[in-house]
Structures are given as structure tokens and as C-alpha cells.
Regions:
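Amphipathic alpha-helical segments
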Residues: 13-28
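Short secondary-structure junctions
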Residues: 26-32, 93-98
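Vicinal oxygen chelate
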Residues: 75, 85-140
Length: 140
């Protein structure tokens, strides 16, 4: 079975986006190209942060620099509150609470079942980030 190991985002400021993911998720920078592209890794999964200025650069057909291709990124985390604090410090935009105001239960801890056990943040360039301690129905 094929396994996901790489994701590529486009950004108007790849360096700033890379700094966000390094601070918020302790990702390591493995390469920075002269054109500004930055490549990160958590030791298992790789992330390329690209900046396409022309149709030829983008390599995605006719959409070029306006290409939209990623809706959100999901991170499995060990401690949701600690990780949420790191995203707050890195400048993330908290889109959902860590505590369910209706039940007082914690989101992302599996108390709602794996299909909804996540907390969402906004990251650089509008990228949506999911975080969960219990994972998702589709993750092993």
C-alpha cells in the first residue's frame, strides 16, 4: 500500500511559513534553495514550502501561481494543550476551541470519537491545521 510521506504548500513567503512550522511543530529545516523554497521534515514526513511566481514554475498546468491544492494538514500530537500553546506562540489563529463549550470535554482527546477528535488552527497563507491526540478514522 502506498503511504503518504510528503506534502507541498505554496506560500508568498516560504521562509516565514517555514519558521511557523519549525516553531509550532519542531520540524527541522533540511534544505533552503536559493530561490527561497524551504524543505522541512519531522524525521518521517517531509514538507516542501514553495513560492511559484510563473506558470512554468508551478508545474501544475494553467493555474500557475494561483494554484490551490491543499485544504488542510493533520498533525498527530502527544499533548494537545502543549501543542496548541506552541501554535499560539508561533502566531497561529485558533479556529476551534480545545474545550467543547457544550460538554466541557476536551476536543482532540478522543472523547468525541476519532472522527471529530481534532482542534483546528489557521497557519501561514491561510493553511488550515488539524491536531489530534487520538487520530482520525482514516489513520492507523
Amino acid at each position: 500500500m502506498a503511504k503518504l510521506r510528503h506534502i507541498a504548500l505554496t506560500s508568498s513567503d516560504p521562509g516565514k511559513a517555514a519558521d511557523f512550522f519549525k516553531q509550532a511543530f519542531d520540524m527541522e529545516e533540511v534544505r533552503r534553495d536559493p530561490n527561497g523554497q524551504v524543505f522541512l521534515s519531522d524525521g518521517y514526513f517531509n514538507m516542501a514550502i514553495l513560492n511559484h511566481k510563473t506558470n512554468e514554475d508551478a508545474d501544475v498546468g494553467t493555474h500557475g501561481p494561483n494554484f490551490n491544492g491543499i485544504h488542510h494538514i493533520g498533525f498527530f500530537v502527544e499533548d494537545l494543550e502543549e501543542q496548541a500553546g506552541k501554535l499560539d506562540e508561533a502566531g497561529g489563529d485558533r479556529l476551534t476551541p480545545t474545550v467543547d463549550p457544550g460538554t466541557g470535554g476536551l476536543f482532540g482527546h478522543g472523547d468525541m470519537g476519532p472522527s471529530n477528535a481534532e482542534v483546528k488552527f489557521g497557519g501561514p497563507d491561510g493553511v488550515i491545521i488539524d491536531m489530534s491526540e487520538s487520530g482520525w478514522l482514516t489513520s492507523a
